[in-house]
């Protein structure tokens, strides 16, 4: 079962009773290359996957962000208790130039896209009511990061 294409969510969202789709909210100070890569990747995802309840993605120019639990992280997913409240994702991209310097442009962009994929996997776990332990959730998110990045890589030469 591919949780990105699983339709368990239909019992909640099939009546068009919520806003749908994925929306990027990118800070003006986010570098052009990161902005471009995220927009292209999001356009590709919209064609390939369903987003039955809107998932805003807040893209920050800082190196880290604070999660709701107070942890300082690179990316986070807010999972509401109510299935009709929109979740959201926040991603920090301020370490792009350091990643580019150490790993190269393509790997730096892939790392940022990977963070988005990881958090979107948590979105799909949430909408499809996938019950796993915390370790299981993270393992699954890490696995799907590689799977989705691999699918995307087949469609272009560079991220």
Provide a role label for each language-model segment.
Residues 2-25, 32, 152-159:
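Long, well-structured alpha-helical subdomains associated
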Residues 26-36, 134:
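A short, highly charged nucleic-acid-interacting micro-segment common to nuclease
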Residues 35-54:
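Zn2+-dependent metallopeptidase catalytic core
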Residues 48, 123, 148-151:
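Short alpha-helical functional segments enriched in proximate histidine and acidic residues
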Residues 68-109:
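Active-site scaffold of zinc-dependent metalloenzymes
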Residues 109-113, 137-139:
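Alpha-helical scaffolds flanking conserved acidic
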Residues 114-127:
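Active-site recognition of the HExxH zinc-binding catalytic motif
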Residues 134-159:
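Post-HExxH zinc-binding segment in Zn-dependent metallohydrolases
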